[in-house]
Amino acid sequence: MKPGLSMLRTAAAATAALGLCALAAAAPGGVNAGACKGTVYLTFDTGSMSQAQLIADTLRRHRIHATFFLANEKTIHGDSTLDDGWAPYWKSLAADGHAFGTHTFDHVYYKGEAGAGKVRFRPQFGEEGGRNVVWSEPEFCAELKRSAERFKAMTGQPMDPLWRAPGGHLSATTEAWAKQCGFAHVAWAPAGFLGDELPSERYPNDALLQKALSSLRDGDITMAHLGIWSRRDPWAPADLEPLITGLERKGFCFATLRDHPQYQAWLGAHPAHTAAR
């Protein structure tokens, strides 16, 4: 195990109990809940994990909750996001009260319909990584549940019945299939695309921050990643803290998707996903 990764995981485990106590004592969103002028729902997809600990620490420091969508992606440390070595990180986030959904296990992109009851996909990772595959509903549902089962094995907690398609690419078919096996799709607001995957030469962090602060509204869902391979000037170290403080100054609170009006009825009617499902 590389020293940097070992230190990251040790920090995650060491701060979990302290973070849980702090979050439990805080009002939702880190400010007086009664004073909220609106709620923004921060969400993070996996990725290179280069900013994973910074993001966790920032959320903990501000005593706010977010929602994470998990796929088994390659990381900067040479392992994958759902390997055993990352269990302390995910356990610490779960202990803090964050919510979790599936991002498919092998980060599987929708590529188009392939005839009656069939859809073409391209996994980014795994045995079929980089190749097109054609799946029916049972195979697609199994792919969604793989992340849920792995999350339960690592944390002891069930995964929320939510999913996000890689790249946001889906069809009426895949959305219906996912609902049949217990997952509602979560997209993001136009203003909620925080731009961390865009080239920093054309989209500098300051411009992305100002755009988000001026555009986000009550109920908006944001989307960023726990690390992006291609961006030279990472987004999170420059923008996450000022985004949170800037929104707090405008009277916004933060919550997980468990509290989003669009998903509350679904979550109330559908059980969380465990390895036993």
For the regions a protein language model found, what residue spans apply to each?
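A cross-family glycoside hydrolase active-site/sugar-binding cleft signature
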Residues: 43, 69-71, 101-103, 163-166, ...
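Acidic-and-aromatic substrate-binding clefts and catalytic sites of carbohydrate-active enzymes
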Residues: 46-51, 72-85, 108-113, 162-172, ...
